[in-house]
Amino acid sequence: MEQYNVKLHRRAVQDLDGIYTYIAQTLMEAETALKLIDRLEDAIFSLETLPYRCPERRTGSYACRGYRQLLIENYTIIFQIDEARRQVLVVTVRYSSRA
């Protein structure tokens, strides 16, 4: 089974940083923040194999434009697949109420 190269758009990196900062500094739960970021990163890099297992995005931002989504806890990871380059580009990671 061929693998895909997973890349994070600058926005996705900023989203992950923001999630960590909010939980660690605002909620004062640094350990919880680290564990959540680990789970989100594990999910993101699981897209190296079988990224088509995730459904196309049908509602909200990025809907019906070829983007796919992966739901992890209360977060939505939104990404595109570039088949020619065998690449998955994660464009954003959003709290589900905003996704």
Summary of predicted features, one role per range:
Residues 1-66:
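Basic, Lys/Arg-enriched alpha-helical interface segments
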Residues 27, 68-99:
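Enriched for short, Lys/Arg-rich terminal
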